[in-house]
UniProtKB/Swiss-Prot annotation:
UniProt lineage: Eukaryota, Metazoa, Chordata, Craniata, Vertebrata
Subcellular localization(s) per the UniProt record: Cell membrane; Cell junction, Gap junction
Topology of the protein relative to the lipid bilayer: Multi-pass membrane protein
GO CC annotations on file: actin filament; apical plasma membrane; cell junction; connexin complex; gap junction
Name of the encoding gene: GJB6
Name of this protein: Gap junction beta-6 protein
Source organism per UniProt: Homo sapiens
Gene3D superfamilies on file: Gap junction channel protein cysteine-rich domain
Length: 261
């Protein structure tokens, strides 16, 4: 897996994220990706080779290992990072579409007063509002779901987050109940708890960011309603102006198509 590509991809979304979102991206790469690349492969590099059972029955060791570890910790963590990072693709695609439309309008002369050139459009920080707000909040919601789902999968597959010193296995073709031992169980337990804790922190950051965006929208709407309440004439004038613009637009379209309004 090319983690550099993942860093470049999510780093591009970082430009349009909130402050909490930037902290989330930092936690993802420092406490999860870097730890997974640097340390996890060393800790779990001897998984099946150093899994020992006190029997010489052919196939017993492999069957017991597959029973207790159906999926490798490293592969499951890597899959979790991919799923958690994928919703950022929604935001990246939305921003790319917005820039494409803005560039098209700029070339048609509709955005000449807003931007100097096309490079200025590319450097613009897109505000999280309108349709982008829905896309951004949806991506956060999916990240929360994926984090919680993978934490449950970890607990379900391994019967908790603690790796025992001795595993009792009585699955065929084992002749009887045999004892199996894994390498460095304490170190792997500490590492597992650390990765789960990082997942919890990321999930809490996602919840905090989602609450922040919801409160921000509520505050903005409350402020807008208060403004309309304090200046009803201005709001009425603005409403009439919008209706007049719609009538003018409809009249223009009817004149072009040749149908009466």
């Amino acid at each position: 897996m090319d983690w550099g590509t993942l860093h470049t991809f999510i780093g591009g979304v970082n430009k349009h994220s909130t402050s909490i979102g930037k902290v989330w991206i930092t936690v993802i790469f420092i406490f999860r990706v870097m730890i997974l690349v640097v340390a996890a492969q060393e800790v779990w590099g001897d998984e099946q080779e150093d899994f020992v059972c006190n029997t010489l029955q052919p196939g017993c060791k492999n069957v017991c290992y597959d029973h207790f570890f159906p999926v490798s910790h490293i592969r499951l963590w890597a899959l979790q990072l991919i799923f958690v990072s994928t919703p950022a693709l929604l935001v990246a695609m939305h921003v790319a579409y917005y820039r494409h439309e803005t560039t098209r309008k700029f070339r048609r002369g509709e955005k000449r007063n807003d931007f100097k050139d096309i490079e200025d459009i590319k450097k613009q920080k897109v505000r999280i509002e309108g349709s982008l707000w829905w896309t951004y909040t949806s991506s956060i919601f999916f990240r929360i779901i994926f984090e919680a789902a993978f934490m449950y999968v970890f607990y379900f597959l391994y019967n908790g987050y603690h790796l025992p010193w001795v595993l009792k296995c009585g699955i065929d073709p084992c002749p009887n109940l045999v004892d199996c031992f894994i390498s460095r169980p304490t170190e792997k337990t500490v590492f597992t708890i650390f990765m789960i804790s990082a997942s919890v922190i990321c999930m809490l950051l996602n919840v905090a960011e989602l609450c922040y965006l919801l409160l921000k929208v509520c505050f903005r709407r409350s402020k807008r309603a208060q403004t309309q309440k304090n200046h009803p004439n201005h709001a009425l004038k603005e409403s009439k102006q919008n209706e007049m613009n719609e009538l003018i637009s409809d009249s223009g379209q009817n004149a072009i198509t040749g149908f009466p309004s």
